[in-house]
């Protein structure tokens, strides 16, 4: 690739403060433009209206066309997830051939330090079915060429690359779904996009973990150190492993089965959407030195294969439990979070996610219905500490406090 071509492409991406500025514009329903007084009539003829008058110019606004509004919504979603680089505007193009004049217009280009997503957007005013044979085959036919271009742009990084076909108000035919599967292209309909938009509102940039777990399901995470000191035991007829792990590692392989239409193919699902307020309180608690000694419950999915556990040389005789090294799957979406999603995701934006260890109890290859039953058993049998006992315990804890405020709370001061 010519250096000039490379620089032109890189200059068409935004990051940092520039990304924030573009996001601000894309998040709005209207386009804005400042014009001279003599051009107002012409702009009004084209559907613009006066937004604000200044001494030397007029600020005009016009509602975005439907296709632009949809693309901007999708663009904004990935920006809010914390992806570092996105295309500056709708004129972004990538070569797909040795002839660099042959280029493909890209609706949305998304990148971070590990991932690149290329997104094609289609929207209709009202729900309908359409034939996307030509569009899908065009993307599929140029896919390898576009990947080659990306590798030439970033020769020092082995990116995970995924193509996404995002639609709104379209019903895809079986033939189109088959074409997407054949080319390895993922379909995001409006329900899927809405789910990730809601998730991002609650989780912020942490929602990216759930996204990556979905689109890269089963793919290897080569840099992950998956060896964990663990205890193997039996309980209720099930084999389980108890261990401590850095939240950062579990976040990479973890996945939460939220109950929503976007996860309908994974039914039965059982988790409610993570609450933003609760997540923030967990992170604040952790960042201020707090910790949760109770275990997060997960199910490790190895596609029916046995998990590798290297027993240590010295074991306690006559003990059912065994100590050793557990080898976790080095794959996205291989650990389903049954209980403790707030405790885990509370670490996602914390500086302690790589330096703290959280306790985990892991079952292996539980059926989805077994996960649901376990989730229900845990939540049905948990009881909050009664208020009377909580007040008594607080009094005991604060009795010897040297803090005047805490003394006043229990009437000691």
What are the language-model segments listed below?
Residues 1-222:
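Intrinsically disordered, low-complexity Ser/Thr/Pro/Gly-rich regulatory segments
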């Amino acid at each position: 690739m010519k250096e000039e071509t490379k620089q032109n492409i890189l200059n068409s991406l935004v990051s940092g403060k520039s990304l924030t500025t573009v996001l601000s514009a894309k998040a709005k329903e209207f386009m804005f433009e400042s014009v001279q007084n003599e051009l107002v009539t012409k702009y009004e003829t084209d559907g613009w209206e006066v937004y604000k008058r200044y001494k030397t110019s007029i600020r005009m606004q016009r509602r975005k066309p439907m296709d632009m509004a949809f693309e901007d919504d999708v663009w904004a979603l990935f920006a809010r997830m914390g992806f570092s680089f996105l295309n500056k505007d709708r004129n972004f193009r990538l070569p797909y051939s040795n002839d660099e004049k042959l280029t493909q217009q890209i609706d949305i280009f998304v990148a971070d330090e590990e991932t690149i997503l290329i997104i094609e957007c289609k929207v209709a005013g009202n729900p309908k079915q359409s034939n996307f044979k030509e569009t899908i085959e065009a993307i599929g036919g140029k896919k390898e060429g576009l990947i080659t271009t990306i590798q030439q742009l970033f020769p020092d990084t082995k990116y995970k690359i995924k193509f996404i076909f995002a639609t709104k108000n379209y019903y895809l035919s079986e033939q189109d779904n088959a074409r997407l599967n054949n080319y390895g292209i993922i379909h995001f309909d409006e329900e899927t996009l809405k789910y990730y938009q809601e998730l991002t509102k609650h989780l912020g940039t942490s929602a990216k973990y759930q996204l990556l777990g979905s689109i890269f399901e089963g793919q290897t995470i080569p840099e992950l150190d998956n060896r964990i000191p663990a205890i193997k035991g039996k309980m209720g007829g099930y084999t389980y492993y108890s261990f401590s792990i850095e939240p950062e590692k579990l976040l990479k392989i973890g996945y939460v089965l939220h109950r929503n239409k976007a996860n309908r193919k994974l039914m039965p699902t059982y988790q409610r959407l993570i609450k933003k307020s609760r997540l923030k309180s967990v992170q604040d608690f952790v960042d201020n030195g707090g910790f949760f000694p109770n275990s997060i419950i997960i199910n490790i999915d190895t596609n029916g294969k046995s998990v590798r556990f290297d027993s240590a040389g010295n074991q306690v005789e006559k003990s059912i439990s065994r100590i050793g090294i557990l080898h976790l799957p080095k794959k996205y979406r291989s650990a389903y979070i049954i209980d403790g999603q707030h405790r885990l995701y509370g670490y996602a934006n914390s500086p302690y996610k790589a330096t703290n260890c959280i306790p985990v109890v892991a079952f292996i290859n539980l059926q989805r219905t077994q996960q649901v039953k376990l989730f229900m058993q845990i939540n049905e049998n948990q009881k909050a500490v009664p208020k009377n006992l909580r007040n008594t315990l607080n009094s005991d804890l604060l009795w010897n406090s040297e803090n005047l405020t805490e003394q006043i709370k229990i009437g000691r001061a």
